[in-house]
From Swiss-Prot:
Involved in the biosynthesis of the chorismate, which leads to the biosynthesis of aromatic amino acids. Catalyzes the reversible NADPH linked reduction of 3-dehydroshikimate (DHSA) to yield shikimate (SA). GO terms for molecular function: NADP binding; shikimate 3-dehydrogenase (NADP+) activity. Its EC number is 1.1.1.25. NADP(+) binds at residues 83, 134-138, 223, 246. GO terms for cellular component: cytosol. This is Shikimate dehydrogenase (NADP(+)). It catalyses: shikimate + NADP(+) = 3-dehydroshikimate + NADPH + H(+). InterPro entries: Aminoacid_DH-like_N_sf, NAD(P)-bd_dom_sf, SDH_C, Shikimate_DH, Shikimate_DH-bd_N, Shikimate_DH_fam, Shikm_DH/Glu-tRNA_Rdtase. The gene is aroE. PANTHER family: BIFUNCTIONAL 3-DEHYDROQUINATE DEHYDRATASE_SHIKIMATE DEHYDROGENASE, CHLOROPLASTIC, SHIKIMATE DEHYDROGENASE. Keywords: Amino-acid biosynthesis, Aromatic amino acid biosynthesis, NADP, Oxidoreductase. It is an enzyme of class 1 (oxidoreductase). It holds the Pfam family Shikimate_dh_N. The keyword NADP applies. It comes from Cereibacter sphaeroides (strain ATCC 17025 / ATH 2.4.3).
Length: 279
């Protein structure tokens, strides 16, 4: 098959992978824009990752998304790593270049910002401190994005203080670390509040941080999207806050990769959201 006739392949690699909504999302976009291409979920064990990445370009893959547990590991296996992926320490989007090199990027932070700007258009992140709960890979992406949009101070709280301290050492003085017992006390005057933990997800412990100090001017977002309306979002809404669920971040972070692989920048709109929720 000649190069111009080849139908591009992309996919998502992780383990487990059955839960991923990415195949439904990319499949919807391919159909919506009438594009030739396929997007394939692949359950790849950690021990097989290097071999699989080496084989994918030969099989016709132009790139792939990366999810748990490989997002950190692929950084070491890539030939080119963007500055933001290096800062975050993880990649979620790979491009297999024609020269044989693997290009690694992280679009999670951009997806986070785009989701808030779309669903809370009056969001003014530079106006007041932000609160971030959690200190894993998602928190790193969110903090990098918040610094980029000009948040003056980030109050970080995590169940493991050591992980939060390590994150502060990477991102600098804008990040202030607080013990988990203070997670509710640090809300005063914050206008951006983000849960990056798995608390509140189906099958996980509930999110139980007191919100008494929460300002009704705050935009509150939860990266958990199963369920869409978490306990945190329900309580924040009851307190008069604008709330944004986590599904939009998933949709927006996927758009740059789709554009690179299939040549069209897809829209993230209500039709996109409905198509993914229907699966």
């Amino acid at each position: 098959m000649t190069e111009h006739m080849r139908i591009p392949l992309a996919g998502v690699i992780g383990s487990p992978i059955a839960h991923s909504r990415s195949p439904a999302l990319h499949g919807y976009w391919l159909k919506r824009y009438g594009l030739k291409g396929h997007y394939i979920p692949m359950d790849v064990a950690q021990a097989d990752l290097r071999e699989v990445l080496a084989a994918m370009p030969r099989m016709g893959f132009v790139g792939c998304n990366v999810t748990i547990p490989h997002k950190e590991t692929v950084i070491a296996l890539a030939d080119i790593v963007t500055d933001r992926a290096a800062l975050i320490g993880a990649a979620n989007t790979l491009i297999f270049r024609k020269d044989g090199k693997i290009h690694a990027d992280n679009t999670d932070g951009a997806g986070f910002t785009a989701n808030l700007r779309q669903n809370a258009p009056d969001w003014q992140p530079q106006a007041a401190p932000a609160v971030v709960w959690g200190a894993g890979g998602a928190a790193r992406a969110v903090i990098a994005a918040l610094i980029e949009v000009g948040v003056p101070e980030i109050r970080l709280s995590n169940r493991s203080r050591a992980r939060a301290d390590a994150l502060r050492s990477d991102f600098g003085a804008k990040v202030q670390v607080f013990d988990w017992v203070q997670a509710g006390n640090i809300l005063e005057d914050a206008t951006t509040v983000v849960n990056t933990t798995s608390l509140g997800m189906i099958g996980k412990p509930d999110f139980r941080v007191p919100l008494d100090a929460l300002s009704p001017k705050a935009v509150v977002t939860d990266l958990v999207y199963t369920p869409l309306r978490t306990r945190l979002l329900a309580e924040a809404e009851a307190a008069g806050c604008r709330t944004v669920d986590g599904l939009g971040m998933l949709l927006h972070q996927a758009a740059p990769g789709f554009e690179r692989w299939f040549g069209v920048r897809p829209e993230v709109d209500e039709d996109t959201r409905a198509a993914v929720l229907a699966t």
